[in-house]
């Protein structure tokens, strides 16, 4: 019985989870002129901006998203990149993420970058 308690203690603390924020960012690839953000341009942006903010890593998933263009009055579907990152709550990181969105919109002439933040428990 003594060993069962020790085993439970080790398992509990080695698998402990921490409270974090999961941030999902959706970067559309279509430009207003009909051209697309190229893979090279995306990789340059990722290395120059995203990797500097998410120094501990992130995941990138190719997705296809839809959004309503209120000026054209129609639903737009486009290829996008979804970036997922888990981080501790911090106003500094939040401002850096806002900056990522700002620069992507400015560089690639985007109306918006969707940002979704949610509280999660993560175990590494």
Q: Can you describe what each PLM-predicted range is?
A:
Residues 18-22, 78-80:
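A general secondary-structure signal for short beta-strands and their flanking turns/coil
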Residues 53-82:
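Short, intrinsically disordered low-complexity segments
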Residues 41-55:
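Short amphipathic alpha-helical segments
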Residues 36, 40-44, 91-95:
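Soluble non-cytosolic domains of exported or imported proteins
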Residues 20-39:
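Terminal, regulation- and interaction-focused segments at domain boundaries
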Residues 75-124:
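Helix-rich interaction surfaces within compact, conserved domain-sized segments
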Residues 4-12:
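Sec-dependent N-terminal signal peptides
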């Amino acid at each position: 019985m003594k060993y069962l308690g020790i085993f439970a203690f080790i398992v509990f603390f080695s698998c402990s989870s921490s409270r974090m924020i999961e941030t999902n960012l959706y970067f559309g690839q279509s430009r207003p002129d009909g051209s697309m953000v190229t893979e090279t341009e995306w990789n340059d942006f990722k290395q120059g901006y995203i990797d500097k903010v998410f120094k501990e890593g992130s995941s990138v998933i190719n997705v296809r998203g839809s959004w309503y263009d209120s000026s054209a009055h129609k639903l737009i579907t486009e290829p996008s990149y979804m970036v997922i990152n888990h981080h501790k709550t911090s106003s500094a990181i939040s401002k850096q993420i806002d900056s990522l969105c700002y620069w992507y919109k400015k560089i690639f002439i985007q109306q918006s970058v969707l940002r979704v933040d949610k509280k999660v428990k993560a175990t590494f």
